[in-house]
Amino acid sequence: MKIKPVKLLVDEALAIVKTITASEVKSMLENPDKNILIDIRDIRELYNSGTIEGSRHMPRGMLEFWLDPQSPYYKKDIPVEVNKILFCASNWRSALATKTLMEMGFDNVMHVEGGYQSLIDFGFKKKGSPI
């Protein structure tokens, strides 16, 4: 059995997904009716380091289910038409998640270069632990 290394999967995703900078995120979020920032990190990461104020938490394991209008778990408060800006801790998981959403048919999905830390470094406000 030959296992494809995760780094190769990430590299393949990065080659086709849209990657945006923290600066671009800031500009996009000036229009919150058309853009949503989604934190796909595990809940334990949010407990340990907080999240970005105004972002929506959608754990990686539920993302596809929560965004699929055909799913019984669909989150109706996030319209299909809204641009979805994903971030994780660095950008590996968000690249893979963005690719998966593209495979589902979303053409309005992208991820943040450098992930959570790049948003913090740029000056996004941190919201504390959800506990």
Residue positions per predicted region:
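Rhodanese-like catalytic fold shared by cysteine-dependent sulfurtransferases
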Residues: 1-35, 43-84, 92-131
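Active-site flanking residues adjacent to catalytic metal/cofactor-binding acidic residues
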Residues: 38
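Short, surface-exposed ligand- or partner-binding patches at beta-edge/loop junctions that are enriched
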Residues: 87
